[in-house]
From Swiss-Prot:
Superkingdom, natural source: Eukaryota
Keyword Chaperone part of the UniProt annotation: no
Name of the featured protein: Kinesin-like protein KIF2B
Keyword Phosphoprotein (UniProt): yes
Phosphoserine PTM sites in chain numbering: 204
Domain Kinesin motor as annotated: residue spans: 213-543
Amino acid sequence: MASQLFRPLTPRLSSLTPVKPHFGHLQAGISVAIQRTDGRIHLAVVTEVRRDNAWVTVEWAEKGVKKGKKVALETIFLLNPALALAGPAAQGRASRSVSLAPPSVIGDQRTAARWAGKIPQRNETPSGDSLAVRVPSSPCLMTQRKSACLREIEKLQKQRERRRRLHREIRAQRARDADTGNAHYEIRRLIEECRRRLRGGRISGPEPRDGRRICVCVRKRPLNRQEATREDLDIVTIPSDNVVMVHESKQKVDLTRYLENQTFCFDHAFDDTASNELVYQFTDQPLVESIFRHGMATCFAYGQTGSGKTHTMGGGFSGRDQDCSKGIYAMVAQDVFLLLKTSAYEKLNLKVYGTFFEIYGGKVYDLLNWKKKLQVLEDGSQQIQVVGLQEQEVCCVEDMLNLVELGNSCRTSGQTSVNAHSSRSHAVFQIILKSRGKLHGKFSLVDLAGNERGADTAKANRKRQLEGAEINKSLLALKECIRALGQNKSHTPFRASKLTQVLRDSFIGQNSSTCMIATISPGMASCENTLNTLRYANRVKEITLNLRPRHRCLYPAEREMPRVLENHIRNSEMSLQGDEFIRIPCLQSEEEKETEGIKVLSSPLVDTTISWKEASQWPDNKIQDTSDEVNCNVDFCIAQLLSILEKKIDILTEIRRKLKLLQADIQKENRHGEVNGERSDLK
């Protein structure tokens, strides 16, 4: 029976004549193995070979239905590697390995089953009438040709894997170099890189201060024990003796952290290694001699609570005890008594008095008289007087220190979440010089209470919160006064609080000289408060003091200090290096010629020209050298140029005004001369 079934097959196979293959041995009419979409592999008959686009059309029967599909040439060669081999031997092997499906068996289920039985089967059996083909366990597959789209996808995948591998290496290197225990180790790394760049560039020193402007200095304290415990970062850098840079941490939309460096320029800047002696040398010591010449000097410390104001003014703490001999109070007293013994001031027969009072809750209390309540009033000459304030005469430095210790013991203080020894009041210590019972000079040392945020005192009791609100209210009033003075407004709200009333003469009083010490905290948690303090101090820097012309000799630029203070400065631990400036020759020669020509016509212009000569010393050599550096700090250069320009604009505006007045006077005199000449001609 089997011989009868396969009898027609032999002549049919023998009648096939070999045809010269195209695209290898692939041609129409042969059976090839194809793969279906569901993964099944079976035989199909090639009906058409498209040479133009390398496609092959195949057909097969399944459940009595003829089906067909188009298969790529690469796919045919992948499943039928023998078709691509060349040579007669390969052709013979191909004819043995590839079977042709007889057309007569298509449609007969039993014949198709027996035909399929002669062919080695694959694991998955095709359904219907389709024939299965065995794929060799280790076939000799051809390399499949890849399309351009597939090659581009593989290229992108390789690039993506290379980037990921590089990022993994970078993260591993950062983990090895950085302290992963700190949550802000990435910000620390950025700050260290910024500081390394700053060390490579040249930083210029402080510029000479104009005597009519408030001296503003900034002091940075070191990280305290509480900040070190929580591993807070130091975000404040002082690259030179008059520049402060704050590294503010920012975050992009993609959560990438970066630094925004904000630069401020002041008269002096002290880092966390500076001592109280160094701070005093460049802040209060130049003002001590002014009170011996009928001057009113003031120094006030401003800053966030816990930033070191009381430490600077009164001295350091050892537990709850304060060493008053290391503060600015004691240093001013020492220099006052030193100058009293000099020959220049000994003949004045001056007596020294001390007062100490505080402003707490909007009220004034005398710290040397059992905290007696005082009143701040204005007399007929519009001078602020503290009524009932007790003045105690002192004869030596030890007596002055006793007053300071007595006042500090009575001063209102408390403990907050930010500072264990927080001052809850504004303290004013005054050193008064009197000659024959009349006021000769006065030095006021003001230790302001620290401004507080509501978030810092949210867990405090009601008393502490009310104290913080009152402190912020008085400091806000002081800020509004400073803003009004900086904008030259007609009204300055000094009566808004007791603090501004007491400090009014320091800003607008005659013969006043003022110094501000802004203390800042270096911790990252205090970044917002630090920036507010620096902006506050930057606005104070623009205020011009009201000086009388007859007392201009009090603060000349080349004034020599007495030898006693000179030796004291020479013996200090360190000194700030001043800049060497150059003059502009063309401007100087022109101004000298103009001064000689108009000296008789306008005497006020001479003073303006002299001040312009002093101010025309531009530090262009320093700025040029800094800009020539490869790693120069652009923010620092811009801040320095803006600081220089702000100082020159006021002088140039005044010169222009005087020149216009002079021009009008000359034109007026010329018109009068012409009229007089015409009258003489008529006569």
